[in-house]
Amino acid sequence: MLDRIIYKKTTLACLAFILLSLLGAAFYGLLFEKASSSGKTQQSKTQSSKVKTARVMANGDILIHNGLYGSAEQADGTYDFKPFFEYAKDWISSADLAIGDYEGTISPDYPLAGYPLFNAPSEIADAMKDTGYDVVDLAHNHILDSGLSGALNTVKTFDKLGMPSIGVYKKDRDKEDILIKNVNGIKIAILGYSYAYNGLEANLSAEDYEKHMSDLNEDKMKAEIQEAEKKADVTIVMPQMGVEYRREPTQEQVTLYHKMIDWGADVIFGGHPHVVEPSETVEKDGEKKFIIYSMGNFISNQRLETVDDIWTERGLLMDVTFEKKNH
């Protein structure tokens, strides 16, 4: 009976997320057009118009709290998280590129945990693959919850399913290529950064930290975003920072995200506050750039009954279409 109660609350929470997500998709969906001066511009689905399009979706935090394991656990002791995505699957699978923000780790060497440390079984990755995600954002403050080995195993788990990730480098941040996906003939670079790692970075050597972690080092971010701008048609940045449960961005967020636009970012999908924060469109060199300061939660057990904040029940599924032309 307890499992059914937990599942019902989870389903209702997911419905709340998706309803707001649909509103978010309608309200925030934008058409971006890159200028053609450098040859980085838009070709096409048809020979006549020579226009190519790429529909990109991204969502807020996927947090597997302790209360959700009861809903996912099966009679044989395995876990099935696929029902958690039931009402979003059709939307996410329809995207040309879907990016999921998985806030946790996947490590068989650590026990399952859902707060303050997060470590889920590999079935969560299976569920995300089944839902239609193509890329996973791991740039968040919980990625070291199972140590560096757990972070690297999380990357490996998604890699095996054909879902590359951002936010953790397998070998060396300074030597690894930026993730660039070719989507319908449009090259899309994706970068992720986290403000910190809940103090667990202290367990890493300075060398391991520099090699593997994608933090908010401005010099490195600037160089990476500028490199992405040169190599790709579109640059998406997913930073994690801000104040939890605050529905307005901090001045630090605003300043840094505008710097990212100046460095070459076209879209910024922000996260971390667990609530939705405002968006804005920025004009740069005659082009439209888009910032959403926080997409909120997508799947979690943060709700009115558990954290006394109804805004944690609301999240966005961003729906952005890019267009590339050759003149």
What positions do the PLM features span?
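Acidic, metal/ion-coordinating pockets
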Residues: 2-3, 7-327
